Amino acid sequence: MDSQRNLLVIALLFVSFMIWQAWEQDKNPQPQTQQTTQTTTTAAGSAADQGVPASGQGKMITVKTDVLDLTINTHGGDVEQALLPAYPKELGSNEPFQLLETTPQFIYQAQSGLTGRDGPDNPANGPRPLYNVEKDAFVLADGQNELQVPMTYTDAAGNTFTQTFVFKRGDYAVNVNYSVQNTGEKPLEVSTFGQLKQSVNLPPHRDTGSSNFALHTFRGAAYSTPDEKYEKYKFDTIADNENLNVSSKGGWVAMLQQYFATAWIPRNDGTNNFYTANLGNGIVAIGYKAQPVLVQPGQTSAMTSTLWVGPEIQDKMAAVAPHLDLTVDYGWLWFISQPLFKLLKWIHSFVGNWGFSIIIITFIVRGIMYPLTKAQYTSMAKMRMLQPKIQAMRERLGDDKQRQSQEMMALYKAEKVNPLGGCFPLIIQMPIFLALYYMLMGSIELRHAPFALWIHDLSAQDPYYILPILMGVTMFFIQKMSPTTVTDPMQQKIMTFMPVIFTVFFLWFPSGLVLYYIVSNLVTIIQQQLIYRGLEKRGLHSREKKKS
């Protein structure tokens, strides 16, 4: 085993990872949008059972804060559109990113209200409530820290239901407060609900391109309970009518995509039912229904829930609800990616540039892993020193493979050499590299984040492919500076083309990730020379043995 064979191992692991990414994405193809309404069988407690009908035609009111631009339908009080002014749709664009949308091509809404036996959103009680509002447009004025949008509905019996959206400056968490005033002679039984519904198939204008071979981020539903901190639920699964039905005190339900999320967080001490449902016409939903509340005659009861609608900013999400920050898609290595991101963010607080922060964290990570790297190179050097003895043994034993294997193991034992010693450090390092990959791909902070010169977006590919080419050049230098005992012509050809193959792979990778690999390769070159000098003093390395 030597450095160049090590590159081959890295390549095989890398290609295996890419194949796994593609398989993970394609093993459950998305269902085609249905042209006719389906009759679905849903789990107990699903949207169909709980009475969450579709929105009707009401008046559209607009709400603008410093970070949100929402459109709310007074028929039901659903949030039908959500724009995020602080996040442009594309780099250099003045058009804000649209998270929630209601168009003939695509549906993504945040629904809420009061269902239950006497709730106005229960279909058994008629159409959804048509709320009254005092004006059509609400704006958070300069110097104002809170904006309230009250919507009131009075039923035929004279009972008053008020739904108030509460916005705060700089906040993507919207509190939804409910007030139920019972003017009758019998108790009212009501339950709050919150539901997110979305079209399964993305239209062209919503496709971010995150489905290419270089990147696979999760788009779907998720939920959290005290027993299950974070569980994903694929849209495909919901579309196949394999629905969620769990009861929980606390927790949340959400819909996720790269960089952005929506979530309903019930705020009560009772038990909530979390559910999913296939609503037909290619639309799926995830939601919650709270435990019923009895409002006695002449009394007024208050209930509340919270809607998160915005970017996946981890510290802010964690402050809104436990484990809501886990919605950032760091994959199965999240337990490594999260502390790495916290370190990256801490570095950024000093240097103020995410690109330079990536460079610094690369030096830190590679410095921490230096003992493993040194052990890897030492093991490979010992293996090279044994090559003449191994070759002589093979010539002496001829085709007797069994004796070759026995004597080779005896030689390794006598020389105190582990033949897999060069692989183990690499295998240990790979999860860290993959965790960095997920961290750089899933963090909203790197979206449209500039570095220097021509790199204006670390989350996008290099428009001129300069960074991938530089990465390939650094791989070439590592290869040329590494001693080798490879004599097989096929392996030599593979080694020769390895930098080219990696360069092609990285052409479509985000600039931040390519920058990490360039710096990591430069650190490898430096560490390689330091290690070789130490090995020379021990007689385990000779510069004359290097082959160009």
Swiss-Prot record:
Subcellular location: Cell inner membrane
CDD domains documented for this protein: 5TM_YidC_Alb3, EcYidC-like_peri
Region feature (Disordered): 28-56
Entry keyword set: Cell inner membrane, Cell membrane, Chaperone, Membrane, Protein transport, Transmembrane, Transmembrane helix, Transport
Swiss-Prot/TrEMBL GO biological process terms: protein insertion into membrane; protein transport
Gene Ontology CC, one term: plasma membrane
Transmembrane segments: 6-26, 350-370, 424-444, 458-478, 499-519
Keyword Protein transport: yes
Biased composition, class Low complexity, residue ranges: 29-42
Coarse class of the protein's main subcellular location: membrane
Membrane topology value: Multi-pass membrane protein
GO function term, MF aspect, one: membrane insertase activity
Pfam families to which the protein is assigned, alphabetical: 60KD_IMP, YidC_periplas
PANTHER family in alphabetical order: CYTOCHROME C OXIDASE ASSEMBLY PROTEIN COX18, MITOCHONDRIAL, OXA1
Chain's role: Required for the insertion and/or proper folding and/or complex formation of integral membrane proteins into the membrane. Involved in integration of membrane proteins that insert both dependently and independently of the Sec translocase complex, as well as at least some lipoproteins. Aids folding of multispanning membrane proteins.
Assembly notes: Interacts with the Sec translocase complex via SecD. Specifically interacts with transmembrane segments of nascent integral membrane proteins during membrane integration.
Family per similarity comment: Belongs to the OXA1/ALB3/YidC family. Type 1 subfamily.
Protein name: Membrane protein insertase YidC
